[in-house]
From Swiss-Prot:
Annotated organism of origin: Chromohalobacter salexigens (strain ATCC BAA-138 / DSM 3043 / CIP 106854 / NCIMB 13768 / 1H11)
Complex formation: Heterodimer of an alpha and a beta subunit.
Cofactor note: Binds 1 FAD per dimer.
Molecular function GO terms recorded: electron transfer activity; flavin adenine dinucleotide binding
Protein name stated in the entry: Electron transfer flavoprotein subunit alpha
Biological processes, Gene Ontology terms: fatty acid beta-oxidation using acyl-CoA dehydrogenase
Length: 422
């Protein structure tokens, strides 16, 4: 009998159709479980209302709108599982899958974590020939949980030659990695933050034909590489399928981030020094940009105001001093205090900021949905029981005007001290 895996098209169709009466049954049979949320075709997160919440002690279902309770198991169970992830150590890998994350701001972005999840799939596909994920990180970084993101080996390159915008020097460093370990796959984010350009330069140097705009990778026994990838083409209007090449540039949400295992992230050292390259590019530093001109969907630091703000001049002054992009709740927009394009939430703009400060925002459900992807949320509010306080990673209870004035004073003093020291 053939050992090739057999696929049931009907079961796959039911698994994709969340309204089918046998949807959860088929998911359980396929080992996927029932999903509580998933990204929709336009990028918005969809939630299954039957999988949100938890059963209270009196048997009544409770729904926590702050986002701390997810799925049917509740937040405590999730936290317990996260604290006891099994540690996976691969002493002698059969091959390497190299990942070059963007590391914007010195930390892994959501795009980087998706890419590491894809690398983990490629490395763990064959238990008999286990691979390892090698992360090549340029410059200083602040990450302390690279192992939880799925990294088995870490190569940290931090030298003046590759600091800043230095694509030629960085490609030379990647060529050295290629000569030292010859990874089976090279994965880079297809982004405007450096990964897209670096991946194309690397492919040209190695003479490889890369795949760009990848959003899906599936196992394929008939493919020469064992994998089939689907990429965006024709300005995003066409899907192109081809065998997965050695160099792949993937989009965000190309795979699920690693969440169930921990890895060692053992540090490696290049066997030879980095080659000296004559760069034809001179990095003159970053160009200062007015935060007010940055679109909310692209902003990394947002200071949002709601109905609790009484002194709008103080709010605008704080946003200017902090260098934050201004946002607003629906109430503030409806009252005419902020323009419509500054509205945050499911009825406005979905934001993915690294830091989101909510000033005087109680936290309507549509607003909480819009800030769900934000990494750190800080709430300034007079009501300690509002939903935004429950959602926030850091909460400050008090008058927003006084708190913003004190914050502006501290930032101004710190800048003056730094200027005097220089």
């Amino acid at each position: 009998m053939s050992q090739l895996p057999r696929r049931d098209p009907r079961q796959e169709w039911i698994a994709r159709n969340r309204l089918h009466p046998r949807h959860e049954e088929v998911l359980a049979a396929l080992g996927q479980g029932a999903t509580s949320e998933w990204p929709g075709p336009n990028g918005l997160m969809r939630k299954n209302p039957h999988r949100v919440g938890f059963i209270g002690p009196n048997g009544i279902k409770r729904i926590d709108r702050s986002g701390t309770q997810q799925g049917a198991g509740g937040g405590k169970a999730s936290a317990s599982v996260a604290g006891h992830k099994p540690l996976t150590e691969i002493a002698e890998p059969a091959f390497l899958v190299a990942v070059v994350p963007d590391m914007t701001g010195g930390r892994l972005s959501g795009h980087d974590k998706d890419l590491l999840g894809l690398a983990r799939r490629l490395a763990d596909a064959d238990p008999a020939a286990q691979g390892a994920v090698l992360a090549v990180v340029f410059g200083s970084h602040k990450e302390t949980n690279l192992g939880e993101a799925g990294v088995d080996r870490l190569l940290h390159l931090d030298s003046p030659e590759i600091a800043g915008y230095a694509p030629e020097a960085r490609v030379g460093a990647l060529i050295t990695v290629e000569q030292a370990w010859t990874p089976r796959h090279w994965l880079l984010p297809d982004s405007k933050l450096g990964g897209g350009e670096l991946g194309r330069r690397l492919a040209a140097r190695l003479g490889e034909r890369p795949a760009t705009g990848i959003w899906q990778v599936e196992a394929d026994a008939e493919s020469a590489t064992g994998w089939q990838c689907t990429a965006r083409g024709a300005a995003g209007s066409l899907d192109i399928r081809r065998p997965l090449p050695r160099i792949a540039l993937a989009l965000a949400e190309c795979a699920e981030p690693v969440s169930e295992t921990r890895h060692t992230a053992a540090e490696l050292v290049l066997p030879q020094p980095l080659p000296s390259t004559l760069s034809r590019i001179q990095d003159l530093g970053q160009v200062s940009v007015d935060p007010a001109s940055v679109a909310l969907s692209e902003a990394e630091f947002i200071l949002a105001a709601g109905n609790g703000v009484r002194d709008w001049d103080a709010y605008h002054r704080a946003a200017s001093v902090l260098g934050a992009t201004e946002g607003a709740s629906r109430v503030a927009v409806d009252e005419g205090y902020m323009p419509r394009d500054r509205q945050v939430g499911a009825t406005g703009t979905w934001v993915t900021a690294r830091v989101y400060i909510a000033v005087g925002i109680s936290g309507a459900i549509q607003h909480l949905q819009g800030i769900q992807p934000c990494e750190k949320v800080i709430a300034i509010n007079m009501d300690p029981s509002c939903d935004m306080i429950k959602r926030a990673d850091l909460a400050v209870i008090g008058d927003s005007t006084q708190i913003l004035e004190a914050l502006v004073t501290l930032v101004s003093q710190a800048r003056e001290e730094k200027r005097d020291a220089a």
